[in-house]
């Protein structure tokens, strides 16, 4: 019996050449709507779907393939005598190939002016039903939803006269991934339209961007996936201008650096190691900002990741060129800066839009057996809600330093302490199991610079010991959430040493 293929695609990439190849193999082709017109326009002989169903396409194409003659031909088990007898009795013929991709729902809802009606109209019904039927019966039916697989199928047909069973299984698995992702997009769109924040089931879909050489360590396998809709201010959608491909750790560190630099509107540069900032500087221009970020910790910056929120110019590039760095991220690089930096063949240069995340952005964290979902921590300092419990208020310069330290401390692994002075961080204490331990690390790193600096803490002081350490180091201003049952003890110590302290009422834990 002559083999038959059903072709109905929204993405018409390569379909004319593929169908031509099928016809050359003696395969009869059935087609629908716009696909049929395209194939006939290119001189290919195809059969209209209505000739198979005996029923016209109706309701603006909503109903055309939802017919027993189609699904019987797809689902019939060819070595089941009952199925074969029923097909013969009803005049059905088997369909051996299905080439279908779905209505462009993703592209439709990505349009800024899309209406709800447009979105609904672009939910495919017949397509998913066909490819699921074909994939279920993949022992007998080859189903292709991705143009990248056309060449593989044609090559096997030419070589063997049929598609290998292993290939059919792979294609079937791709179908169910394809429909699952498609349904997830629809589910998420409708859920968002209804304003539901915590649905009873969560469906997420990501698209493979690249395989990685390995994960956090060489013995771990890893892959990088991107969100289906472009998040322009992200590493996933950054443009790489130069250098080796990104590693797993590169991606994590670059994401951390980008998150911090988004906090600043003035020219700023952030240096990151192991997802913690080692130096942050701001200035009147990007060169000055980088100089301060470098001076913040000239040891730890070696082998680090740099993020800037302004174009990298030649002067800044020449300074960056002096040390070993893994990645530089910026909105752009001047032509002269690129010439300087591209002389280092392994240095990765990325361009990305610098836009602060919104609270609508969700952070997903996997745990064993589950997934945590929360809003991104995008809350900025609100000066209208702060309180100053100490006798002395911060000076203008202290306020400037406090604000910088507060912007940075929320991005440091808890327990977190950050010291800032003169438009730069001078000490970062991260990830200690007690707060005073983090304070001691930050103070030790700052050394003599701690005198007259400002301290930020991501959470309240359970005891006054951190304030005591700050006083010993000559720190003159502190910003912290407040809210401890022993706040009064910390306030008394601050007043004793003339330290100005600000309560924000907001905690910024980061785990």
Curated annotation (Swiss-Prot):
CDD domains: IMPCH. One of its GO terms (biological process) is 'de novo' IMP biosynthetic process. Disulfide bonds: none annotated. GO terms for molecular function: IMP cyclohydrolase activity; phosphoribosylaminoimidazolecarboxamide formyltransferase activity. Pathway: Purine metabolism; IMP biosynthesis via de novo pathway; 5-formamido-1-(5-phospho-D-ribosyl)imidazole-4-carboxamide from 5-amino-1-(5-phospho-D-ribosyl)imidazole-4-carboxamide (10-formyl THF route): step 1/1; Purine metabolism; IMP biosynthesis via de novo pathway; IMP from 5-formamido-1-(5-phospho-D-ribosyl)imidazole-4-carboxamide: step 1/1. GO terms for cellular component: cytosol. Belongs to the PurH family. This is Bifunctional purine biosynthesis protein PurH. It comes from Bacillus thuringiensis subsp. konkukian (strain 97-27). The lineage of its organism: Bacteria, Bacillati, Bacillota, Bacilli, Bacillales. The gene is purH.
